[in-house]
């Protein structure tokens, strides 16, 4: 039975001696009740006052009209909490008038403002009310006096006897811990047995409200008061609930309880549902999740929940801490056990054949499964014969039924899941039934189990070896090569070893760590993917480039037919020449029309004819020293350079010798670059005869590399305020930014290190950007027929030195490696030194040439 707390409340009109009160308590339990005249008058006054209180009140504005007025003339229902003090004074005056002024035990009321439950109440404390809104107002209106006395007494309590068990209440029926209280009220806490005549009013309330919150009330964590754990708040709520219960039930029983319990007997206050009453403990609000919480309560609730979750997480980490660091015990010094590589590796050891995770039947082939089943059947027959003597003690019918059921239900599962052949285990004798001793029973069982273990281990070893022998042919090539060299036994190669050995490392070397191997393989595969993507992109660009070249070749012929010297044709030609070089069929014709128009004025008027110079050479005896110089020039500037092919026809060398001799005896004489121009034009299919080569080389030297162009090149490239000085404003070019390294002669050193295709492409670009619009500004033979070359050059020759300067800047910024400066570039002994790079692959060579021309175009646009 749940312990009930009986609180005796002595009226504040009397002051009892503690000893006398104990005696009176014992007498009241055994004697009938007697009332004096003063006591009857006080009970009648109390009854009228309680009857005048309203049954229920709402917190709305209409509560003022429905409230009644007590005998003292004050409105109790609508008064403020601070008015309780005046109400107490009025009550004391009435009591003094009834009992008389001679009573020395009448206490003096202390002016303490009562504590209102409205400021901290979080849920209803009323039991029988129909609406929730009336709960707080009713309990406040009817329990002002009792709540004042309860709050004052709560501050003076020392011991809370309510939470003691019923067993102590039986042995100690009357325990009244007293303490001097403040003047105004005395609170006595007494434990008594249940009396029907004393608690007829309050027992029903207690039995109604105790079962709902029995566990929470019995827990001392529900309220905390300094020095009084869980006592004051419970007493206050009990007083408020019982007063509310009495005021709401207007019956004779109520009047009887009011008259008897108010004056003579202590009030029994019910235990009500008080989730949070004057307590700051977080544990109080945790069980009441349906209660509307204040912000501070929600904060403490979240804080408590976070602390609990953190404790659980720490507890789980501490629980599994040892399992996470098991591998640390395997380390010896600085060497991890996983890096021990010189021990033969096998998938299953002799002690691990019982584990099911490492042995997977599904990886075995159908033939091996059938072979294992045949071996299993044969050995089962042998084992059955050997253990026939021990099986006689068991019922044959049970053995047949059990073995058949076991074989039919577990045969497939045993082969797939278990490494042990449990059906090979013979039925053992039953101790106590079969005539077999305990020692014999244990020996037979151990013998049978040992045979099963040995047989299972042998069978697994045979199956693994047979599987390895069949998978020898499917091993990687690295293992086969190692086996042929005597470094590997293919029968010892297991799946674990296949996983440990990397394909990028020989099998006889120590295996890499798993994480390292995984990381390196990932990086290798990533680089391979990038390389493959780059190669695919290059192939795509190469295909697009081939299509573009075919289109440009068609455009060349179309522009030539339309008129290459037109302004529109010339502008379009200057665009596509950076993408595709001129083809051999149209190169000679385009060169001639762009530099001297269709009438070939320069060739006819200002260049010596090939026949005249040839006749002059045949008539004269060419000087030997001059011939020696020409041979040295061919060997140094042609045969030792990258563009010279070892399989070059000797006729080309002899023709080059002849053309250089002719040039040396002509009016212009030998100039820088003649040997390279003659050699490349002789080896190219664009120029068929020596005459065409002679005329074209002289035409290019007189127009594109004239004296005026060379002078501008030498002066502008060294201009400290020019774009070249801005681009070359680096410490690396400090020693070569001078006239000795940067001039028109060293410019030809760049062309010495280019192959034939790039050299011809460079000539195409230079000639196209030196072309003139002869369609709009034609050249008339009559005007310049009798004029000197200098006059014609000043009128009709374009000096485009920027195309030469941009080529120099491109080489210095992007291809300046392997040499100190352009002057020393011609003295390099490496024949394979090439600009941009040396390669024998024609596809790669074309790609490099495209990149070179793109950079050249970039710097040319900056200089324009």
UniProtKB/Swiss-Prot annotation:
<dbReference type="InterPro" id="IPR031403">
    <property type="entry name" value="Sbe2/Sbe22_C"/>
</dbReference>
<dbReference type="GO" id="GO:0031505">
    <property type="term" value="P:fungal-type cell wall organization"/>
</dbReference>
<feature type="region of interest" description="Disordered">
    <location>
        <begin position="123"/>
        <end position="142"/>
    </location>
</feature>
<comment type="similarity">
    <text>Belongs to the SBE2 family.</text>
</comment>
<feature type="compositionally biased region" description="Polar residues">
    <location>
        <begin position="72"/>
        <end position="84"/>
    </location>
</feature>
<dbReference type="InterPro" id="IPR053948">
    <property type="entry name" value="SBE2/SBE22_N"/>
</dbReference>
<protein>
    <recommendedName>
        <fullName>Protein SBE2</fullName>
    </recommendedName>
</protein>
<keyword id="KW-0961">Cell wall biogenesis/degradation</keyword>
<comment type="function">
    <text>With SBE22, is involved in cell wall integrity and polarity processes like bud growth, through the transport of CHS3 and UTR2 to sites of growth.</text>
</comment>
<dbReference type="GO" id="GO:0015031">
    <property type="term" value="P:protein transport"/>
</dbReference>
<feature type="modified residue" description="Phosphoserine">
    <location>
        <position position="83"/>
    </location>
</feature>
<dbReference type="GO" id="GO:0005794">
    <property type="term" value="C:Golgi apparatus"/>
</dbReference>
<feature type="region of interest" description="Disordered">
    <location>
        <begin position="16"/>
        <end position="84"/>
    </location>
</feature>
<feature type="modified residue" description="Phosphoserine">
    <location>
        <position position="532"/>
    </location>
</feature>
<feature type="compositionally biased region" description="Polar residues">
    <location>
        <begin position="213"/>
        <end position="222"/>
    </location>
</feature>
<dbReference type="Pfam" id="PF17076">
    <property type="entry name" value="SBE2_C"/>
</dbReference>
<feature type="compositionally biased region" description="Basic and acidic residues">
    <location>
        <begin position="17"/>
        <end position="26"/>
    </location>
</feature>
<keyword id="KW-0597">Phosphoprotein</keyword>
<feature type="compositionally biased region" description="Low complexity">
    <location>
        <begin position="123"/>
        <end position="139"/>
    </location>
</feature>
<feature type="modified residue" description="Phosphoserine">
    <location>
        <position position="450"/>
    </location>
</feature>
<keyword id="KW-0813">Transport</keyword>
<feature type="region of interest" description="Disordered">
    <location>
        <begin position="213"/>
        <end position="235"/>
    </location>
</feature>
<feature type="modified residue" description="Phosphoserine">
    <location>
        <position position="82"/>
    </location>
</feature>
<keyword id="KW-0653">Protein transport</keyword>
<dbReference type="InterPro" id="IPR053949">
    <property type="entry name" value="SBE2/SBE22_M"/>
</dbReference>
<feature type="compositionally biased region" description="Low complexity">
    <location>
        <begin position="51"/>
        <end position="71"/>
    </location>
</feature>
<dbReference type="Pfam" id="PF22874">
    <property type="entry name" value="SBE2_M"/>
</dbReference>
<keyword id="KW-0333">Golgi apparatus</keyword>
<dbReference type="Pfam" id="PF22876">
    <property type="entry name" value="SBE2_N"/>
</dbReference>
